[in-house]
Amino acid sequence: MFQKQERIGLVVYLYYNRDARKLSKFGDLYYHSKRSRYLIIYINKNDLDTKLEEMRRLKCVKDIRPSAFDDIDRQFVGNLHRDETNNHQKG
């Protein structure tokens, strides 16, 4: 049966757009902004450390930023109510 794998998005900034094809071997290339010269690549969380190390060694990569999606609170129902009660308790 199909197993869902944990994945993480990486924003990879490039020096030149022509080097985008070199990074497609590391994961699924989701978006390429030619104007701002960055890519969004999704890779498996298991391979994160090794692939980051390999990508940072490339001369075409300027910067790599992992996605903060896991750190964001995604419980939207009742968010305003929770914020109001926290502010009243502090003040």
UniProtKB/Swiss-Prot annotation:
One of its GO terms (cellular component) is cytoplasm. InterPro entries: DUF2129. It is found in: Cytoplasm. Pfam families: DUF2129. Keywords: Cytoplasm. Belongs to the UPF0298 family. This is UPF0298 protein SPy_0397/M5005_Spy0329. It comes from Streptococcus pyogenes serotype M1.
